[in-house]
Curated annotation (Swiss-Prot):
Residues 61-112 form a coiled coil. This is Protein FAM107B. Belongs to the FAM107 family. Pfam families: DUF1151. The gene is Fam107b. It comes from Rattus norvegicus. The modification N6-acetyllysine is found at residue 50. Keywords: Acetylation, Coiled coil.
């Protein structure tokens, strides 16, 4: 390889170029990181660069396994647990029906409420006369 001209000339007025310092090589943190990446690469622990589709498929498989385990756990419920769940559902249904009736009564027009009151008072008067 040809040597540059400024090496042969010993002219003190010339500014001689100096080799640039590589900041990557001088940085201790970067050297440690590079060494760690090389070691992981040799061991096969390199960061996984999986395509997005593969990641989604793995996530779906994990979700599917979790769902299957939950279903198996539900299938293995004892008779007592099943009976308790049935009773709880019945109570919830009764409570919902009760709330619906209350809402219907509250939302009913005024004349329907008055008519119901008149019937009750009429029945009470009839019962009082019979006794």
């Amino acid at each position: 390889m040809a040597e540059p001209d400024y090496i042969e000339d010993d002219n003190p007025e010339l500014i001689r170029p100096q080799k640039l310092i590589n900041p990557v090589k001088t940085s201790r943190n970067h050297q440690d990181l590079h060494r760690e990446l090389l070691m992981n690469q040799k061991r096969g622990l390199a960061p996984q660069n999986k395509p997005e589709l593969q990641k989604v498929m793995e996530k779906r498989r994990r979700d599917q396994v979790i769902k299957q385990k939950e279903e198996e756990a539900q299938k293995k419920k004892s008779d007592l647990e099943i009976e308790l769940l049935k009773r709880q559902q019945k109570l919830e249904q009764l409570e919902l029906e009760k709330q619906k009736l209350q809402e219907e009564q509250e939302n009913a027009p005024e004349f329907v409420k008055v008519k119901g009151n008149l019937r009750r008072t009429g029945q009470e008067v009839a019962q009082a006369q019979e006794s």
